[in-house]
A protein has these predicted regions:
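Detector for the c-type heme attachment site
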Residues: 120-127, 151-152, 188-189, 278-284, ...
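Short cysteine/histidine-rich zinc-coordinating motifs and their immediately flanking basic loops
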Residues: 129-135, 287-293
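Bacterial N-terminal signal peptides
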Residues: 11-24
Length: 344
């Protein structure tokens, strides 16, 4: 395992966002099945694959004394950035500036020392990654409401070690109302596009946790999917370089899309309610209600679990309590698989 981990580090050779200097990776099978310590008093155990928690970086894995100053490039871009630039939380590597409006300061640079650039984690086009939200096209008032919920302790995570969510309530909530309005107006003005390829399958690549997401082992090995969603980058190097044109593939159990469609469109004989009632035709949103079509299925499952556990307690989330109360993990997987397969 250590040889595989070392080879993985050498193959990728990239600094990660957040806390680790070297790429920390570990086999999913070696993690506890919650992805980290649970929050107290939970109704639903959080699945590890939806709350991918970085393992501690081993001392032998650290490369603090190695500074890579070489320029990196991605397809269809004239830009070039160093690995250090692509790992700076207060700097957004803008590979495709023509693909989005000009970024306001809070999106492009954040505000030091604690408010990270919105566009670093959520990407310049807002499409985000499995560990965070896709903000593109969300209603501005909804984005502002979520920031208020983070600030007031009304939005938390079922896994306290899941830092992408924790940092929103600890650091990003320090943004001023003006900064929140600017960021919300920016992201709501971006048209969402397909970002996730959903594939039904019986077997999936074995994965490791790196950078708060699942990545495939190298060399690749396969295992049964079971009751899981395995969402992983289409191209790991481009994803770690923050390329906002390189998306993700979500492996889902065979039959889950059809099962999810039945739950979403009919309510599953009283198990839930038809999602279009609030989320609109095509689940693309309605008024201040967010669209859920084409969004990360890992993210969708996380939100349902957090709602069941009472950790999303804002006004909008309160309306969801009865909607998600009867769902089991298989239902969540099916719903997330179906919604992710839709055009955003």
């Amino acid at each position: 395992m250590w040889e595989r981990r070392r080879n993985f580090h050498l193959a990728v050779g990239l600094l990660l966002s957040g806390t680790a200097i070297a790429l920390a990776a570990v086999a999913v099978g070696e993690q506890n099945q919650g992805g980290g310590k649970y929050a107290e008093g939970m109704h639903t155990a959080p699945p590890y694959w939806a709350y991918a928690v970085n393992p501690p970086a081993a001392k032998n894995d650290r490369k603090a004394d190695v500074v890579d100053t070489s320029l990196r490039r991605v397809p269809n871009s004239e830009a070039a950035f160093t690995v250090l630039q692509t790992s700076d939380l207060f700097y957004v590597p803008d590979w495709h500036p023509g693909g989005h409006p000009p970024m306001p300061g809070i999106v492009a640079h954040g505000r030091k020392p604690k408010i990270f650039a919105c566009g670093y984690c959520h990407l310049p086009n807002g499409f985000g990654r499995p560990e965070n939200a896709n903000l593109a096209g969300l209603p501005a008032d909804y984005i502002a409401e979520q920031m208020s919920d983070f600030k007031n302790g009304l939005r938390k995570t079922s896994v306290p070690e899941f830092l992408p969510a924790v940092s929103m309530g600890k650091y990003e909530q320090l943004a001023s109302e003006q900064e929140v309005r600017e960021a919300a107006a920016y992201f709501t003005g971006i048209k969402p596009k397909p970002w996730i390829r959903v594939l039904e399958t019986d077997s999936v690549p074995k994965t490791q946790v790196a950078g708060w997401m699942l990545v495939a082992w190298e060399p690749r090995e396969m295992e049964p999917i079971g009751a899981r969603i395995i969402e992983t980058p289409e191209n790991l190097e481009r994803t770690e370089l923050r390329d906002d044109t390189s998306g993700f593939i979500a492996y889902v159990p065979v039959g889950s899309i059809a099962t999810g469609k039945a739950l979403v469109t009919t309510g599953g004989e009283g198990k839930t309610v038809p999602c279009a009632t609030c989320h609109g035709t095509g689940l693309q949103g309605m008024k201040d209600v967010p669209g859920i079509a084409g969004r990360s299925p890992s993210y969708v499952v996380r939100q349902i679990v957090d709602m069941q556990n009472g950790l999303r307690a804002g006004a909008g989330s309160q309306q969801m309590k009865s909607v998600v109360a009867k769902l089991n993990i298989e239902d969540m997987i099916a719903i997330a698989a179906y919604t992710a397969s839709l055009n955003p």
